[in-house]
Amino acid sequence: FKEALNKNFITYQKQVISNAKHLSECLVTAGFNIVSGGTDTHLLLLDLSNKNITGKAAEEALDSAGITVNKNTVPFETRSPFITSGIRIGTPALTTRGMENKEMAKVAEMIINTLEHIQEPEFHKKTRTNIKDLCDQFPLYAELASKNNYQ
């Protein structure tokens, strides 16, 4: 609990939520439905019913593009829990890397483009390269990597 009282942790948590809200807004602007219309937490639940994409297909396509999400049921779900109509997206890992709202817009664009090209594995490879480039700008353990000259 001591960490939660730290000013840096409070700032981090505010950024996690800000990132989730911004990511949500970008996806809504592109015509995606967010369960509850948005988010006030670190997670958002994307309902893909209006896009005729299953949660399982979205999870697999995004994974091949280097974006980790989880398939998830949505309210009034009609599909099997092994297939689902939604995906769950969280922002803590992105925020931990130092990403902010500007980067959430880029992540949203890559999610949108991947789902629009869900049947195109070559497109997923291109997106995976873009994801790697973005992550390289925000390395985990940057201090350790620079100290030891890791690439």
Locations of the language-model features?
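Hydrophobic alpha-helix feature that most strongly marks membrane-spanning transmembrane helices
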Residues: 2, 21, 28, 49, ...
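Conserved PLP-dependent catalytic core of the aminotransferase class-I/II
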Residues: 2-35, 40-41, 56-65
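Short, charged low-complexity intrinsically disordered segments located at boundaries
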Residues: 3-6, 24-30, 52-57, 90-92, ...
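Short beta-alpha connecting loops at secondary-structure transitions
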Residues: 4-12, 43, 90-96, 116
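Composition- and surface-driven signal marking solvent-exposed, interaction-prone regions
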Residues: 12, 40, 58-60, 73-74, ...
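PLP-dependent enzyme catalytic core of the Aspartate aminotransferase-like
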Residues: 18, 81-151
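Conserved PLP-binding catalytic core of the aspartate aminotransferase-like
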Residues: 33-87, 91-98, 149
